Each structure stands twice: as C-alpha cells, then as structure tokens.
Amino acid sequence: MTILGEYALWIALPVSVWGMLLGYVGGRTQRGDYVLSAERTIYAVFFLLVLASLGVVSAFLGDKFEYWYVASYSNREMEIFYKITGLWAGQRGSLLFWAVILAFFSTLCVFLNRKKNREFMPYVAGVLQTILTFFLIVLLFADVNPFEQLAFTPANGQGLNPQLQNYWMTIHPPTLYLGFTAFTIPFAFAVAALLNGRLDARWIELTHRWILLSWLFLAVGIIFGMRWAYEELGWGGYWFWDPVENASLLPWLTATAFLHSIQIQEKRGMLKVWNMSLVLLTFLLTIFATFLTRSGLIESVHSFAQELKIAYIFLGFMGGVLLACILLIIYRLPKLQSENSMQSFLSRESAFLFNNLMLLGFAFAVFWGTIFPLVAEGVTGEKISVGPPFFEKVNFPIGLVLLVLAGIGPVIAWRRATKRNLQKNFQIPISVGLFVAVSLWMAGARHGLALVTWSVCAFVLTVIATEFWKGTQARARIEGEGYAVALFHLVTRNRRRWGGYIVHVGIVMIYFAFAGAAYNVDERQHMLPGDQVDITSPFGHTYTLTYEGLSVSLGRGQRNLLWQAIATVSVEQDGVAKGILTTEKRQYVTSDQLMTEVGIRSTVREDLYLILSAMDDVDGALSANSAAQGIDLQVLVKPFVAWIWYGGLILALGTVIALWPSVDRRRRSTRPELEAVTTSAPAMAGAAR
C-alpha cells in the first residue's frame, strides 16, 4: 500500500497540470468537452491523493522506519490512534493532508455545480487545479516528500512529541486545515468572475456558504487550539500570541471582515473592489499560515520546519498569485464600479465599513507583530521577540470598538439613520449597559478595562435580546402562535439573519470571559506532605488546598512513558470538601524534557488550576521516598474561563443555523406588519453572514 501511495502522488502531478490547462482553455474557448475533462481530473487527483494518504498511514501502522517521516514521528511503542494521526503530525504529512482536503473540497464543489453555474466552472476548475498543482510540486520537489527513504532502517523511530499526544491536538490541526482549504472555493469563484467578467453579486451568492463553512472551521479550530494549550502546555493560559497561533487568527479576522462587507455589495451594489481585495487577502493569509508553520523562518512551538527551500517556493507562489489578481482587478475596474455611494456616516453601510477597518487594523497589528522579529533580524542582525504585552496593548482597544459595533450594526438603518431610529434602537441597550457598569462598580469591581468590557457586553446582549423579543412578539400576534413556536419559526424562516445574532451571543460570551482575566489569582507555594494553603478567590470564598503527597510510577500503565510523578491535592471551598486534584510531571522515553500535566477544577464561575512547577529532588522522587518529597505548587484561580468554551459552542451553533438553507420564501408570511419587524439584515461582528 505504501508503494502504491508513492506512485499515486507522482501520477497526481501531471493529471493536475493537465486539468489546470483544460480548465483555462475550456473557459477561453467555451469548449464543453474540455471543461468536463477538467472537472474529471479533479476527481482523479482526489482519488490519487487519498491513495497517497493511505500509503503514509499504512507506513505508520506497519512501523516502516525506512521512511524518514515515519522514523521521525513514530515508534513501536506509540498507540495505534496516534500512528494514524501521524499523517498530520509533521511537515511532510501535513502538507499532503492539506492537499487531500483541498482536493476533497474541490471535488465537492465540482459535483455540486455539475449541472448549474456553468459560466463559472471552467475557470473555477482551472484555479483549483492550479493550487493543487502548487502543493504537489512542493510535496515532490521541495524536499518534503513523505515517502522519502533513509539510507538505512533504524530499529525504532523517534516517536511523536508527547505534547502532541493529546486528544485536542488530534482534531485541532485538521479543523484548521478544513478552514484554510475551504476558503479556496470562494477565491476560485472570485477569480472566475474576474476572468469571465460577471462581476455582480452572483459569485458571492454562490460562495456564501463556503465562506461561512471556512469561517466556522477556523473559529472552532482556534478554540480547539486554545483548549489544548490550556490543558496541555502547563503555563496557565490559553493564548500566547505565538506566531503560528497568530497565523491562524489572521485569515479568520479578514474572513470576518469579508462576511460583513459582502452584505453591502448584496444590498447596495457597493464595495466591489474592496470585496475582491478581501477575498484575495484572506486566501493569501491561509497560504501564509501554511508557509509560516512550515518554512522555519520564525520560531514557534507549533513549527514543523526543517528546510528553507520550501519558504522560497511559498513566497514565489504568494507573490505570483498577488500579482496576477491585482492585474485582473485593474483590468476589470470599469465593471467593478459601485452602483451607489455612502449617504451618511450614521448608516449600516458606514458601521460595516468601520467594522472592516477595525478588523483589518487588528489583523495588521497581529501580522506586523508576528513578522517584525524576522524583519528586525534581517536589518540589524540581532534576534528580538515581540511578546503578549505588545499585542494586548494594541489590540484591546480595537477589540472593544468591534464589540461596540456588534451592537450597533444589527439595528442601525441602511442609507441614513434618523434620530428616531437611533433613539428607538439604542436608548434601552445604552441604559442597560450603564446600569451594569454602575452595579458592578458598587459591587466592588474596580478594574476599569474589565468594567467597560462587561458593560459593552450588556449593551450588545440587550440589542440582540430586543430584536429576538420584537420578532417573536410580532409573529406570535400576527400568526396566532405561542411564543416558543413563534421563536422557532422566526429563526427557521430566516436562518441567515437569526443565526448571525446567535453568533453575536457567542462572541459576547468569549469577550466576557476574556475580561475576567483581569481578576486572575496567581500564587506559588513550596509544600511538604500535609501542608495546607488558603487561596482567596476573586469572588470572596476561600480554597483550602492540602498537599497529600507524591506518587511515582516507573513506566507503568502508559506506553512510551519512562516515569510519572503525581502530586495529589485535596480541595476544600469554605470548609466544604470539593474533591481531589492531581498535577503531574512526566518523562517520556523519547524526550529529555519534563512534561507537565495540570489539574483543573472547572465551574461556570471560575477555574481552579494547579501546576506542579518543581520537585525538591527528582532523583529522590524516583526512589522509595517519593511520598515525602516537597514540591513547588503554582495555584491559579481564573474567573469565567469556561465561558470561552460555552461561547465557542454558541458561536458554532449560530453559524450552523446560518449555514442551513432557509425555508422557501414562498412559504414565509408576506404580511407587511410581520415583514417590517423581521426582515432587516443583521451585522455579524463575529461571523455569520
């Protein structure tokens, strides 16, 4: 199977090149047979890449250490599950995995459009095959072929990084890859529109769900990565502004901007050049994320890179795509003129445009902070780093403005908002926000940034709740339905709008959790068995932690484990027993680095987070006297962290609702009173239109 996979990878390249040529020539000559053949080559490339992927997995399962990739990321002791996920554990396999997902989405796109939208499909097939060809060239000629063999066969492999042997890391990278590759479809349709000259909103209509799908996978993938960092890395946080973390955030930010700005083109026929530029930028940032992870130019705990040849190939590809698309946009400028103009600063168009500027400002700050160490080293020859303080200082005010816009955008009028519109829609939400601010201040909340954030969260939630209430009440009155039934029908009759509101709720929940970090408690204690320490929560209650002792297992119970030391801590809250937490140090056979496993007690209100920072005597801990060992214990109390994960679920739910096709418009009520209440389009600060 492995040999078959290697042959399949080599065959895929000429097939892809042939399909690329057929697509462009078919679009130019309008030859239907050429177009059909181009589409069939996409099916063929997908099949061949699946065979190649199965070949790599077969090599992992068969412990074929004659292959460099298998020897580098597996060993005989590794569990079968992690051998299968070894396909995307390293640079070579992850590039192949990327290509096979891209081929899958390309196949799905061609299949769904086999009998419609034929004016776009020749060039769509050509663009998709161009990108597939690029990845195949990288795999075969950039020293990253997963089927490369060693000069000798080692007795065993090096094994997978223990930090990657975690369930979150088995789903975090694939989810991000799904998000990155799914955005290739909107990009392909945008380029097809530039090539065939159909530059109305049709290409946006055809790709809207693809954009949402990509946005959803990126958002969920980022949250999965945050969860992995929180549970596995053992430093007490979930986001460190690591270069590769930033690289995954960048296309999500620009895709969010794109989801807002396309509404202006759909509604008013404006921002056509802007939208073309945003779809190009977002696609390039998905490639940039791949480049950054695999080029070796910037150090990261996530980076797979070993060779720099791949960096130059990626840079050349991105430069070529950028130049070609800019030339196409310039060529089509006469057809990309706006049909209307901005009539007032106080309008939904202005709110969306300002939202775009803030998102792009956020993205630029992240991008510049990420690449600045590389630029500075190239200019001065000295290595520097840009840490979390820079990103947080620059991006917090931008993020707060975006949160405010999440409350303004959904209800402000198109074209020009009147004084009555502003008063009607914002008087109650602003009052609620101010009331929350005063109440929190009187309750003792004195951290200014957190106080402002929570007040704005209350403002946005009130806007959304008011919209749901007005729509439900109107439908219940007009259709004679109960409120629960009316709410259900309200959402299902316009999933795109109300799904967007639900996404807003998820975003607000995540902001709420982020603001809670202002009240984190962080204490470190040296403890001997039997010692107790009291930790006061930001909410006023007291945790009493008792260190019960250290237990050591020498390679028992888990493959590839040399030893593990488990510190047991009993937890009481205001004198009431709350259970036992454990935190560990682990030493793996294939790694000299000690790994930390944290203990977490999570509630809706706060997380109690324990880290075994150090043991008094590691050698002594491995002896019979391990139970008497002293430890350094780091204790953190982190308010509202669970709301990040809850917010992620709500965000995903809202996006799925927005993705789902709405009920046929012919089945909707056409009563003017109901339509007036329920058909205004929403803004989505987090994503769903």
PLM features: residue spans?
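Solvent-exposed, non-transmembrane regions of integral membrane proteins
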Residues: 1-689
